[in-house]
Amino acid sequence: MQLLLDLHPDQYPLEGFRQRQLLEWVFVQGVGTFEAMTNLPAQARADLASRFRLNPFREIETVRSADGSVKYLFTLQDGRQMEAVYMPYLDRKTICVSTMVGCPAKCAFCATGAMGFGRNLTPGEIVGQVLAVAGGEGLAPRELRNLVFMGMGEPLLNYENTMQAARILLHPQALGMSKRRVTLSTVGLPKGIRRLAAEDDLGIKLAISLHAPDEATRQRIIPTGHRNSIAEIMAAAREYQAVTGRRVTFEYSMLRGINDHLWQAEELADLLRGLVSHVNLIPMNPWDGSGFESSTEEQIQAFYDVLAARGVDVSVRRSRGKDAGAACGQLALKRPAAAVGASA
């Protein structure tokens, strides 16, 4: 049976105002069954229920953090598992969604990378995370105004499904998100970055997980990094900016004694010269078996100071949800074996 959420809103069944009613039930009201769509004719509801399913998930569990963040563990219909994170702030509500079960990038400091790759998520399994989190938090779906593709997986390796999900998220009759509030994070795939730049109708923001300015360190941190050199990644980032006019964000996880040397801050500043960019320095979040430690606060500040003195727009991003295993780099800590197990 087809998952209704996989469809673009323009492809939804029914016609005219009945289609608009259906879209409102799904994306505005956030109902989970066709039977609850009481202003649709009974026959239409029965027909929909015979052709489509609304729920991508078999089970949903939550782990709540003291800071208000919530990790959602989703069991998909095939038994695989993946996670999303809800992060409430005073001025906004943000959701971090996954695009894959596991991840093939294998970043050494990231728990998701240690899982390996399970499979790509469908558009509906991506969008469904937003609807499920909204429901779990007692929110209307459109109250989640900020979204980052920064959960499990490499979005640019699940390109078509991620782009379809983004178009659903932005569609005015679906979730109606602002493109300025949606960010896609990639480990740095030049072909995918250039392809994203050509998506004229999207306009979502780009973040690149760089983590080192030199090849030797980056390949130690990201074992698959040898496939694309830093020079190739930076060239693609510059092309992206030339085409879109948008700022590029660079994510930099601070690993003690690995990528936090001041000479590396100097090299990073050199790499970014002439590019309108922002650098997020992220203290590494611990997980069992990682083999890495976060840089000290003093070293992070010193690294920051070098970048700032060189004119780099830089900030230190304090991760939320550490105590719930929901912070950056911690996703997949709960039952990773089940998450990447064989399909039922």
UniProtKB/Swiss-Prot annotation:
E.C. designation(s): 2.1.1.192
Cofactor: [4Fe-4S] cluster
Location within or outside the cell: Cytoplasm
Keywords: 4Fe-4S, Cytoplasm, Disulfide bond, Iron, Iron-sulfur, Metal-binding, Methyltransferase, rRNA processing, S-adenosyl-L-methionine, Transferase, tRNA processing
Domain Radical SAM core, chain residue ranges per copy: 89-323
Top-level taxon of the source organism: Bacteria
Disulphide bridges, residue numbers: C96-C328
One Pfam family linked to the record: RlmN_N
Recorded GO CC terms: cytoplasm
Active site positions: E83 (proton acceptor), C328 (s-methylcysteine intermediate)
InterPro entries the UniProt entry points to: Aldolase_TIM (IPR013785), Methyltransferase_A (IPR040072), RlmN_N (IPR048641), RNA_MTrfase_RlmN (IPR027492), rRNA_lsu_MTrfase_RlmN/Cfr (IPR004383), rSAM (IPR007197)
Keyword Ribonucleoprotein among UniProt keywords: no
Entry's Gene Ontology BP terms: rRNA base methylation; tRNA methylation
First-listed, main subcellular location of the protein, grouped into a coarse class: cytoplasm
Gene3D superfamilies tied to this protein: 1.10.150.530, Aldolase class I
Cofactor remark from the record: Binds 1 [4Fe-4S] cluster. The cluster is coordinated with 3 cysteines and an exchangeable S-adenosyl-L-methionine.
Catalyzed reaction equations: adenosine(2503) in 23S rRNA + 2 reduced [2Fe-2S]-[ferredoxin] + 2 S-adenosyl-L-methionine = 2-methyladenosine(2503) in 23S rRNA + 5'-deoxyadenosine + L-methionine + 2 oxidized [2Fe-2S]-[ferredoxin] + S-adenosyl-L-homocysteine; adenosine(37) in tRNA + 2 reduced [2Fe-2S]-[ferredoxin] + 2 S-adenosyl-L-methionine = 2-methyladenosine(37) in tRNA + 5'-deoxyadenosine + L-methionine + 2 oxidized [2Fe-2S]-[ferredoxin] + S-adenosyl-L-homocysteine
Record GO terms (molecular function): 4 iron, 4 sulfur cluster binding; metal ion binding; rRNA (adenine(2503)-C2-)-methyltransferase activity; rRNA binding; tRNA (adenine(37)-C2)-methyltransferase activity; tRNA binding
Binding site for S-adenosyl-L-methionine: G153, E154, S185, S209, L210, H211, N285
Family indicated by similarity: Belongs to the radical SAM superfamily. RlmN family.
Note: Reaction proceeds by a ping-pong mechanism involving intermediate methylation of a conserved cysteine residue.
Role summary: Specifically methylates position 2 of adenine 2503 in 23S rRNA and position 2 of adenine 37 in tRNAs.
PANTHER family: 23S RRNA METHYLTRANSFERASE, RADICAL SAM CORE DOMAIN-CONTAINING PROTEIN
Protein name (database record): Probable dual-specificity RNA methyltransferase RlmN
Name of the gene: rlmN
